[in-house]
Curated annotation (Swiss-Prot):
Keyword Amino-acid biosynthesis included in the entry's annotation: no
GO cellular component: cell outer membrane
Membrane topology per record: Lipid-anchor
Lipidation (S-diacylglycerol cysteine): C29
Protein name: Outer-membrane lipoprotein LolB
Lipidated positions per record (N-palmitoyl cysteine): C29
Keyword Membrane: yes
NCBIfam families for this protein: lolB
Amino acid sequence: MSACPAPRSPVRWLHAFTLFLLLAVLAGCVSVPKPMAGAGEDVFSRVGRFAITVTESDGKQQAVQGGFAWRDDGGSYLLDLTNPLGSTEARVEGRPGMAVLTRANGERLAAEHPDALAEDALGSPVPVTGLRDWLRGRLMAGAAPDGLERDAQGRPTAFEQDGWNARLSRYDAQGPQLLVLQRQEPGRRILVRLVITQP
C-alpha cells in the first residue's frame, strides 16, 4: 500500500469517502457508462447521486454530495466520482489483487483489496466489496447478515452486514435504486444515501 496522510478529521473523512463513492462509489451531469472492453453478460452499470452525512457525538454534522458512475464486469470495476457540478473528482479501478484510486490532482493510492484501500484512505472500514453486491440487490458473500428482511419477490430490503445497517428499495431489473447505509462508530454516526438516476 502506498502512504496516505494520517488521522482524519470529519471533514477530511467525508472528503476521502466522497472519493470512493459512492459509494458511488458518485450529479446528474454524468453520462451513461459505456460497457467495459471485453465485457460479457455480467456487465453491470449504475449512475446516480450520493449524499454522506457524518454526525459527531456532540451533534455537529458534516455533509457532502455528488455523483457516481459504476461499471462492473464481475471481475473488475470502474467507479468515477463527480462533484455536484459534474467535474470528475476521482476514479477507482479494481480487479482481483489490485485496487487503485486516482484523484483529480493525479495522486494515486493502491492496495491489494478495495476494502484495504478504503480503510487506508479513510482510517475507517468501508464496505467497498459489500457495495458491489448491494448495488445488485445481493447480500455480501462471507458475512452473515443480521435482521434480514425481504420483499415479496425475495429481494433483500433491510439487513445489517459487516457493521453497516442497509436498507434497499425501489428495485428495478438490475437492483435497488435507493440504498441507505448507516454505521455507528465511537463518537460518530455515518449515513450514506445512494440514489440511482440511470440504469
